[in-house]
Amino acid sequence: MSNPCQKEACAIQDCLLSHQYDDAKCAKVIDQLYICCSKFYKDNGKDSRSPCCPLPSLLELKMKQRKLTPGDS
């Protein structure tokens, strides 16, 4: 498995570039990355790593701040 959630991470870069780095306009793609990463950690364990995903503790905080649950899509 190479770089899980890379597609979602690249979508964030594309979105930010096309919206002059206004992250508010990219909230949906950011949420999609967090949901993908949550699934990645659920499937592979919290000791797994992907360069595209924040560490599990930060991911949990970000998902809580954005009111996301792992089952969202």
UniProtKB/Swiss-Prot annotation:
Span(s) of short sequence motif Cx9C motif 1: 5-15
Chief location category: mitochondrion
Keyword annotations of the record: Disulfide bond, Mitochondrion, Repeat
Any one cellular-component term (Gene Ontology): mitochondrial intermembrane space
Annotated localization: Mitochondrion intermembrane space
One Pfam family named in its UniProt record: CMC4
Coiled-coil regions listed in the entry: none
InterPro entries cross-referenced by the UniProt entry: CMC4 (IPR027179), Cys_alpha_HP_mot_SF (IPR009069)
Ranges for domain CHCH: 2-44
Ranges spanned by the short sequence motif Cx9C motif 2, renumbered to the chain: 26-36
Disulfide cysteine pairs (residue numbers): C5-C36, C15-C26
Protein family per UniProt: Belongs to the CMC4 family.
Domain topic, free-text comment: The twin Cx9C motifs are involved in the recognition by the mitochondrial disulfide relay system.
Identification of the protein by name: Cx9C motif-containing protein 4, mitochondrial
Origin organism lineage: Eukaryota, Fungi, Dikarya, Ascomycota, Saccharomycotina
Designated gene of the protein: CMC4
